[in-house]
């Protein structure tokens, strides 16, 4: 399973998302859209124009943000 988290340096929910993924022992790739302008275009395309972070992509499918991630976890998606 490939997990990508699009985030920024100033986003507290992004930190919370990364902390939860670490707690759940789920490896992920972090893409900091505020550090690399090329990632902004990718972020917009992959997330269908989402403007808020974090945004999470699992196996090339955009699943949404923090609450969507926790809902997947509660539903047993990562078991």
Give the ranges of each region predicted by the language model.
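Local sequence-structure signature of Cys/Sec-based thiol-disulfide redox active-site neighborhoods
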Residues: 1-29
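C-terminal alpha-helical interaction module
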Residues: 2, 7, 44-45, 73-75
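Short beta->alpha junction loops/turns
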Residues: 10, 33-36, 62
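Residue-level recognition of oxygen-bearing side chains
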Residues: 16, 38, 68
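Non-catalytic interaction surface on structured domains
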Residues: 22-27, 45, 71-72
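Thioredoxin-like thiol-disulfide oxidoreductase module
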Residues: 33-50, 77-79
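Structural micro-motif
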Residues: 48-56, 66-67
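Non-catalytic, surface beta->alpha helical segment in thiol-disulfide oxidoreductase systems
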Residues: 58-79
């Amino acid at each position: 399973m490939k997990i990508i988290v699009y985030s920024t340096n100033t986003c507290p929910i992004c930190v919370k998302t990364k902390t939860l993924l670490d707690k759940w022992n789920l490896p992920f790739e972090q893409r900091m859209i505020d550090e690399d302008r090329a990632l902004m275009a990718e972020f917009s395309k992959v997330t269908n124009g989402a403007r808020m972070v974090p945004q999470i992509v699992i196996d090339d499918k955009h699943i949404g943000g923090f609450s969507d991630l926790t809902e997947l976890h509660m539903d047993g998606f990562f078991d």
